[in-house]
UniProtKB/Swiss-Prot annotation:
This is Uncharacterized gene A6 protein. Residues 147-164 have a biased composition (Polar residues). Residues 101-114 have a biased composition (Low complexity). The gene is A6. Residues 101-166 are annotated as: Disordered.
Length: 210
């Protein structure tokens, strides 16, 4: 059998190998072979394998990590495809109180004496609260039907049920009116109005998250 020499068995070392700068000693099965300058030159390959030892000076090109608020992060998109903007700064707790607490009672003389530009909105809020209370009473069955003075309607249960039905329809009608007024542009009248779910409005109406 033909016996291979040590230099023939050794893998060719390119001139750009970091081992050349580290002393030129290559570990092979035959033992350490020193760098031989007379070997056949190998065409350059740009690092066919990662270098064994990377000579890094860890104090060169040192940069402190930037603060997290200085890093530019692209806006991510939520599952609806709406671009979410960064959250607003925290609001103090005093402004988080519900606005209904600051409104005076409708029966107090102060609300009647002070005439502001917000009278319509206060009346709307009061009306909304009354309608919500009426609907809650209707749901739990705690409505007191209006007592009729005539003994005939009082004796018949049909009169009481008709009065209750009338009050129920009136409360629901007022509630729907206020709901339509609050929704504003979201209320679309048409043959398919009942089939439209909230996703329809989220897709069609441009919602700005700020």
């Amino acid at each position: 059998m033909h016996k291979h020499s040590a230099t023939a068995d050794m893998l060719p070392i390119s001139a750009f190998s970091p081992l050349k700068f580290l002393g030129g000693v290559v570990a092979t099965p035959q033992g350490p072979v020193l760098w031989d300058a007379t070997t056949t030159p190998v065409p350059f390959q740009a690092f066919p394998c990662p270098p064994a030892i990377t000579p890094i000076n860890q104090f060169v090109n040192y940069q402190p990590a930037p603060a997290m608020d200085k890093i530019w992060r692209p806006a991510f998109e939520d599952y609806r495809g709406v671009t979410m903007r960064p959250a607003l700064p925290e609001v103090p707790e005093t402004s988080l109180r519900p606005a209904l607490q600051e409104l005076p009672e409708p029966s107090s003389p102060q609300s009647q004496s002070s005439v502001d530009d917000d009278t319509d909105s206060k009346e709307d809020v009061t009306e909304t609260l009354e309608c919500a209370q009426a609907l809650t009473d209707l749901k739990w069955g705690t409505v007191d039907p209006p007592r009729s003075t005539s003994p005939v309607t009082a004796s018949t249960s049909s009169g009481v049920s008709s009065d209750l039905q009338k009050a129920k329809e009136q409360a629901i009608r007022r509630y729907r009116l206020i709901e339509a007024k609050d929704l504003g542009k979201l209320v679309v009248r048409g043959p398919k109005k009942d089939k439209r779910d909230p996703d329809f409005y989220i897709k069609k109406v441009p919602l700005h998250f700020s």
